Amino acid sequence: MRHLRTSPPSRAASRLTVLTLLGTLTACSMLATSVAAVASPTAQGSQLTGVVLDNSTNAAGTSPSQTTGSNSSNGSSKGSGGSTGSPGSTGAKIPKGLESFYRQKLTWTDCPDGATGTAFQCATVTVPLDYDHPQGKTITVALKKLPSTSPSPRGSVFLNPGGPGGSGISLINIHAGLYKTGGLSGVLANYDVIGFDPRGIGQSTPITCWSPEDVQAIVDGRAQAPSQLTPGSAGDIVAKGSRDAATCQKYTEVPEILDHMDTRSVARDMDVMRALVGDQDLNFLGYSYGTYLGAVYTELFPDNVGRVVLDSAMDPTLSRQGSFEGDAAAEEQTLRTYIESQQGQAGFPLNGSTDEAVTRLATFLDGLDANPLTVSDGADSLNRAEATNAIKELVVASPDKWPLLNEGLTQAMNAHDGTALMKNAGFLPGEGGPTATEAQIVEHLQSVYGFAANRCLDFPDSGNQASWDAALASYRRDYPVFHSLVPQHNAYCHGWGHTGKTEPVDVDVDATNPVLVVGILHDPATPYPWSKALVSKLRNSHLLSVDMYGHGATGFNSCATAKVNDYFVKGALPSDGEVCAANPEPRAEEQAPAGVGTPAGVATLAGVARPVGSRAG
């Protein structure tokens, strides 16, 4: 991780703390608010109810920990196979030794959104900390349900926003309008829609890698949030990973969870949740890293797969570092497309051949650490990573943002002023919303460290200092503009220490039911070839291609949203080779209000612009 400066942070730097954090670490995390959705803030203090195991002991004879809740019930939810909603009666096999977890009684209580009045229900599920030793410690997973508009829904659809480290509870808060009145209203007419916080995240048993004083310093602008882009050698990165893990160990209430936040464990949690809502098969919508989670679930539980949509897919064959490198390559290619489309325009500062333009921009950015850009009244300044983040957010969003990037680059390169660049990216006060709150900063920090914990655990320790340093040098050559946003994660995980003991799950399976994969042709976070690679590994799957820029099509592209809705409602699959066109440009009177329809990959949160779908996974 990288602290961007050693001197006290400027106002621009403090605004960029969360931006840098997620821009450098969170590859595919939360998606943009959809065009059809009504954005709503995360409900604070939502009441989470507990579960009661229906056996006094688990299979090993040890009593799992329990929490209490109200006695309100889930109602008559049925699995996609028509089974009843009582725990353990879905017809799917219960893994040996986990009977008590699969048969616990799930209770729901009302937890309405205070801002919108949306009638959510909340619950918690108890799961083993370590599935290899289910008689040991337990943890909880938090769920939030948007109940179906049908009195007799056919089942539930679970959501994951990506990350890893993204909050499904935040996603259901934000996307409720998409299901209530938007393009996925057919889903809500047939299913309950459930967001959940994966283990270690949010309202589930969390990791905590910071003190209250650390958070307050970030809120006040006295400190920057951490970044995984540590300057210097691989040795410096290893040391940073070690310090971060020690901090997590110190402040996390259940520190053992740092060894059990892998994707395999999250997928097993989902199977417990599937059983507890009474579904024979898992119905699931996963974005970005959530596609990898869905693919791992399909590999582990091929007979329990219902209707599964994997949007903006990861390539399940990539290594830990390979996903970062694939992102950077896609971003560089999108930048080249941008440059080629703008050359010849009056005042454009990157004319000449494309290679010459890329070199000119890279050289300019490389000089910003020694001579930062000024911003606004001169009290702010921007170094290389900060300016590169702003460029990236504008270039990867969509071509309609490229004139704004032209304006920002022209001012930056001709007048050494970063004001237009930051303003057009939405990173200045008044452009990105009010000041970040403590709760929002904590959510970001959890997603960042949740990302580290998951990606480090999903792969064994890999490489050595010489190979890591060689990779860092190659990034500067191969990704001349965006190399400063590529972390050396293998080195970081070596220092972090909580790494995988086995190889990643080998996804190569025929699921019982067909899986729908949605791939975006111009996706800079999870490049389109990754979706094709996933389809090749999920042999009973179908690919829907979407001709748009951005990350995450469902809820943003009207054609893709309709196809996903039809798949969940009717089981309808796209024809071979089917491509959804980009949305038509709206007329001025049809433009969405502020905060709605934010370009995929960029969502403003509390004055700190946060690139939410930007790196590795």
Predicted feature locations:
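N-terminal non-cleavable signal-anchor helices
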Residues: 19, 39, 52-53, 423, ...
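C-terminal region of N-terminal signal peptides and the immediate post-cleavage residues
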Residues: 28-62, 80-89
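Compositionally biased, intrinsically disordered low-complexity segments enriched
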Residues: 6-10, 15, 29, 64-90, ...
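Intrinsically disordered low-complexity regions specifically enriched for long asparagine
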Residues: 53-57, 66-71, 75-99, 124, ...
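Gly/Pro-rich cap/lid or specificity-loop segments adjacent to the active site
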Residues: 90-387, 453-617
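Alpha/beta-hydrolase-fold enzymes
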Residues: 344-453
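Secretory targeting and sorting signals
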Residues: 1-41, 125, 270
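Extracytoplasmic/periplasmic regions of membrane proteins
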Residues: 49-52, 62, 67, 105-110, ...
